[in-house]
Structure formats: structure tokens, C-alpha cells
Amino acid sequence: MTFGKQADPDLTKLLDKKLAIKLNGNRTVHGILRGFDTFMNIALKDTVEVVSPTEKYEIGMVIIRGNSILLMEPLESMAYVPKTE
């Protein structure tokens, strides 16, 4: 790890996985990760905005700016692969 240098996000293990994304403004969306860039902007497909446990809205394909993401949580199980350096 190098201090002072920002590393690119490594979200490749989350590609094609269903995620819960918490956004600023107290918004939450669930969707399947289709892509990302170095600024952690993400593309989600089959996206659903979760307003409450009983209120959900299907919004389809979306692009979310990285600076509005507070938390990303996988909703599917993932295989653990140790990082090699």
C-alpha cells in the first residue's frame, strides 16, 4: 500500500452480482453491477429504488456517480479469493 496515492476501485469481483447501494440523500437502490470506472461511477441494470420495505420502484438501467455512493453491499454470496501481491 502506498500512502498519498489513491488506488482505483477493484469491483471486478462484484460484476454481475446483485448489490444494495446506499446513496446520499437517504436513498437506497438494489441492482446488478454491469460496470464501473476509476471514479467509482457505476452502471446498474434491473435497478429497484427501495423507499421502504413495502414501497419499491423499478427504474431499470442507471448510472450512479461515485461521489454519491455511501455504501455498497453484495446481496449474493461470493467466493473468497485471497489477494496476491
Curated annotation (Swiss-Prot):
A Gene Ontology molecular function term of the record: RNA binding
Alphabetical keyword list: Cytoplasm, mRNA processing, mRNA splicing, Nucleus, Ribonucleoprotein, RNA-binding, Spliceosome
Stretches assigned to the Sm domain: 6-78
Domain of life: Eukaryota
Gene3D superfamilies: 2.30.30.100
Subcellular localization: Cytoplasm, Cytosol; Nucleus
Cellular component GO terms held in the UniProt record: catalytic step 2 spliceosome; cytosol; P granule; precatalytic spliceosome; SMN-Sm protein complex; spliceosomal tri-snRNP complex; U1 snRNP; U12-type spliceosomal complex
Task of the protein: Plays a role in pre-mRNA splicing as a core component of the spliceosomal U1, U2, U4 and U5 small nuclear ribonucleoproteins (snRNPs), the building blocks of the spliceosome. Component of both the pre-catalytic spliceosome B complex and activated spliceosome C complexes. Is also a component of the minor U12 spliceosome.
Subunit structure of this chain's protein: Core component of the spliceosomal U1, U2, U4 and U5 small nuclear ribonucleoproteins (snRNPs), the building blocks of the spliceosome. Most spliceosomal snRNPs contain a common set of Sm proteins, SNRPB, SNRPD1, SNRPD2, SNRPD3, SNRPE, SNRPF and SNRPG that assemble in a heptameric protein ring on the Sm site of the small nuclear RNA to form the core snRNP. Component of the U1 snRNP. Component of the U4/U6-U5 tri-snRNP complex. Component of the U7 snRNP complex. Component of the U11/U12 snRNPs that are part of the U12-type spliceosome.
Official protein name in the record: Probable small nuclear ribonucleoprotein G
Origin species: Dictyostelium discoideum
Name of the encoding gene: snrpG
